[in-house]
From Swiss-Prot:
Gene3D superfamilies: Nucleoid-associated protein YbaB-like domain (3.30.1310.10)
GO cellular component: bacterial nucleoid; cytosol
Predominant location: cytoplasm
Pfam families: YbaB_DNA_bd
Function of the protein: Binds to DNA and alters its conformation. May be involved in regulation of gene expression, nucleoid organization and DNA protection.
Presence of the UniProt keyword Methyltransferase in the record: no
Disulfide bonds: none
Name recorded for this polypeptide: Nucleoid-associated protein Bsph_0039
Bias (Low complexity) ranges: 1-12
Protein family according to the UniProt entry: Belongs to the YbaB/EbfC family.
């Protein structure tokens, strides 16, 4: 019977960790991350859920003769913002898997 108490304790720890993970994920989803390109002339904001929230363009980068440059700047800013989300996700959620020796 001694092992049952240990098992219950482990289950409680797992439930607590699961709750903390859900709270951390919700907080992460509520955050916004900004990517910038062209010296701040293009700004893209994405949510922690990796959805584009806004795109802000300085008038000076809107050149009908050079749409490709504007497209490139938007891509760069978007990728930067998404990278920030990924880094924050890894650092936040990594706390929960650290030391578990999971096979994946």
């Amino acid at each position: 019977m001694r092992g049952m108490g240990n098992m219950q304790g482990m289950m409680k720890k797992m439930q607590k960790m699961q709750k903390e993970m859900m709270e951390a994920q919700e907080a992460l989803n509520a955050e916004q991350f900004e990517g910038v390109a062209g010296g701040g002339m293009v700004k893209v904001t994405v949510s922690g859920q990796r959805e584009v929230v806004s795109v802000n363009l300085d008038e000076s980068v809107v050149d009908p003769e050079d749409i490709e440059m504007l497209q490139d700047l938007i891509v760069i800013a978007t990728n930067e913002a998404l990278k920030k989300v990924e880094e924050k996700t890894n650092s936040t959620m990594g706390k929960f898997t650290q030391g578990l020796n999971l096979p994946f």
